[in-house]
């Protein structure tokens, strides 16, 4: 936890992706594809190096665009007043049912330990987490939220807007799939779950969690502002599960991606029968859509 967060900057990860391309002996690739946290990373690859990444496919997490530079705040007192405005995160905590945003929880010192050494065991934690965010959990029926307010955010499931006094392992334990549901699952086989359990048992989750801390810290903000107003102009596409709240968790991002961030958006697909893990829950359809997109580039 107590580590330098600068390696987790978005543009440093782009540099890693660029290094990988060159390590394989190429100077460009047909496309870059990213899911979840990899979706904005793929987008930033496309923004910063369109000469290398000729197209982009984003999955689950819409890219709302490059940041805008502050303007119109010459009046110092006005800026100070804006900085004192109430926080939606604070508002969540004082709802009738007190809540907290999962990304804020992931920034806490205890988050890694809570999940890594979950009371129910690591394997059961991962299984419950995957189930809770999948289409197998029938209450995943996402829709557009009216805005970025505590009241609207609180409409999302607890894996995104957690109960204030619970950690993530406790949160998903309440939605552990039954033996029947586990037996019917075709997209998270035991051998795959075993790999996840072994590897996360070895490494823990802190590396990934540091990405959330970096984002909230403001580290790297100045360097990405170099690309303020820049759009993704190469061919792009977006895929998400029809039951994935990730599409709508940041109100307005799904629309901004299509209307402003990407000027050559070729297709948007919300795949039925899939939640957050679209590439696993509906692997055949996801592969078909990606191949169709890639075939259309030539």
Question: Could you tell me what each predicted segment is?
Answer:
Residues 263-298:
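Catalytic active-site module of serine/aspartate enzymes centered on a nucleophile-bearing elbow/loop
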């Amino acid at each position: 936890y107590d580590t330098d967060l600068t390696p987790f900057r978005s543009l440093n990860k782009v540099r890693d992706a660029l290094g990988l391309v060159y390590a394989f002996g190429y100077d460009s690739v047909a496309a870059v594809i990213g899911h979840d946290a990899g979706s904005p990373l793929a987008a930033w690859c496309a923004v910063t190096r369109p000469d290398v990444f000729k197209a982009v496919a984003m999955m689950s997490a819409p890219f709302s665009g490059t940041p805008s530079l502050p303007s119109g705040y010459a009046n110092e007192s006005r800026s100070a007043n804006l900085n004192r405005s109430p926080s939606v995160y604070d508002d969540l905590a004082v709802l009738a049912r007190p809540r907290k945003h999962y990304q804020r929880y992931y920034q806490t010192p205890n988050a890694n330990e809570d999940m890594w050494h979950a009371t129910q065991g690591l394997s059961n934690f991962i299984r419950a987490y995957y189930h809770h965010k999948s289409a197998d959990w029938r209450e995943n029926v996402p829709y557009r939220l009216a805005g970025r307010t505590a009241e609207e955010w609180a409409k999302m499931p607890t894996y995104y807007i957690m109960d204030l006094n619970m950690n993530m392992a406790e949160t998903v334990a309440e939605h552990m799939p039954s033996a029947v549901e586990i037996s019917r699952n075709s997209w998270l086989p035991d051998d795959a779950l075993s790999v996840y359990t072994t590897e996360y048992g070895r490494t823990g989750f802190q590396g990934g969690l540091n990405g959330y801390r970096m984002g909230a810290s403001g580290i790297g903000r100045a360097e990405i502002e170099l690309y303020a107003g820049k759009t993704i102009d190469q061919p792009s596409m977006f895929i998400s599960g029809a039951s994935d709240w990730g599409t709508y968790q940041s109100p307005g991002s799904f629309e901004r991606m299509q209307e402003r961030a990407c000027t050559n958006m070729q297709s948007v697909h919300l795949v039925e029968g899939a939640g957050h893990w679209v590439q696993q829950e509906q692997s055949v359809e996801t592969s078909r859509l990606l191949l169709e997109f890639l075939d259309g580039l030539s």
